[in-house]
Amino acid sequence: MDMDDIFGTARPVSLPTKSAIYVWGYNQSGQTGREGKERQLRIPKQLPPELFGCPAGANSRWLDIACGREHTAAVASDGSLFTWGANDFGQLGDGTEEGRKYPTKVKQLQTEFVKSVSCGAHCTAAIAEPRENDGTISTRRLWVWGQNQGSDFPRLYWGAFPQNTIIRQVSCGAVHVVALSEDGLLQAWGYNEFGQLGRGITCEGLQGARVINAYAKFLDEAPELVKITQVSCGEYHTAAISEKGEVYTWGLGSMGQLGHCSLQSGDKELLPRRVVALDGILIKDVACGGVHTCAVTQKGALYAWGGGQSGQLGLGPQTGFFSCVPNDSKSLLRNIPVLVVPTGVQLVACGNSHTLISSRDGRIHGWGYNSYGQAANEKSSYAWYPSAVDWCVGEVRKLAAGGGHSAVLTDACSLKELCEFRLADSVTPMNASEVGDVASRTGAEALARLCERLREHMLDGGGCGYEDEISGERI
């Protein structure tokens, strides 16, 4: 297969010279893209181009990456979508329920140019444009498949939106999905037993799509329509950012994941409600995990709230009970946003019980549940504080976190980064010291950190005897 068939430039978009996808963590269903029998892969490693049908060493380029509970999806620069991992509910989009441990193109979307993808627990959603479109008019449409989506193949879905509505973003939760239109409207569908659809009521059974048109800015005022710019679905809760940089949350809040000191409906919030603790703070990014939520401010600070039993808030080991006190260090649950990282954060991703961030200095940090190495380089089952993940090179463009695995999409946009990409492919335990020394002297910080991690890994006896993912040999 010709490389341009997969990684061509079918759209006039700005592309890096090369991209890399790193996937690691829990691998029971092959969600890391390796065909081996390893149950877990604790070291991030680039997925080689040949996995996607390209020649070894090809300059692969990627647009997006997403993680579900046990499946993964990636968008190539030519608009092709690849999926792999668990498929028990048809979430891979191939019309079967057979899992795959290697990436395969979703053939039913070959007439579409996929722009972005989102993975829920057992479903997948993608935003795409028809390939015959000349690119002068945006026609971004929504495709869904998997659990509760009515098909094991991708199907075009308008829901409550009028046909030809331009879809800006989609986010999938455990059993619900929310889509954002270019006009700033949200529509939600799926299960609503905890109010995660934002309708003001709870419902039994699968619910069709409906536009969310009531947002509670103040409890003593009537709800009103708010223009939304971003949305994120957690397991049973939802968060959104308004055009004014405000955060609204709704759904299950029993673990403090909504960020409200008190809830209006027992352990739930049935309508989108503004997180007043963040008043005056402009938020640019929000991410929902299983029972926690994180937000990044315009100035690069990270706030977190919700359940912290596994360390997913990054605040250290905690014992105690629910607390409304913002700085109560004994609280197991933080139902009011607390500052975790004061500055420098660019991106955040929340998995079921772990969190990843990337910083302006190009580094990645993770924390939370770590039994499969999905959060940090540490051997421990819990990473209580932000811990560096120094196995990736290139400029971080996207972070993704799933049930027990993680993924990073990086770009090489400069000659230095391209050289780091090339050298990283050839680093082994035998030459790590030499390459690392040269990298340090020439300012190749990411490559130097990778080599240092590998040296530490060697001194540590190969990390508890697991297979070394850099050299392919047991150290």
Sequence positions of predicted segments:
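Post-BTB helical module
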Residues: 412-471
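Acidic, low-complexity intrinsically disordered termini and linkers
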Residues: 474-475
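Eukaryote-biased RCC1-like beta-propeller repeat architecture
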Residues: 1-414, 426
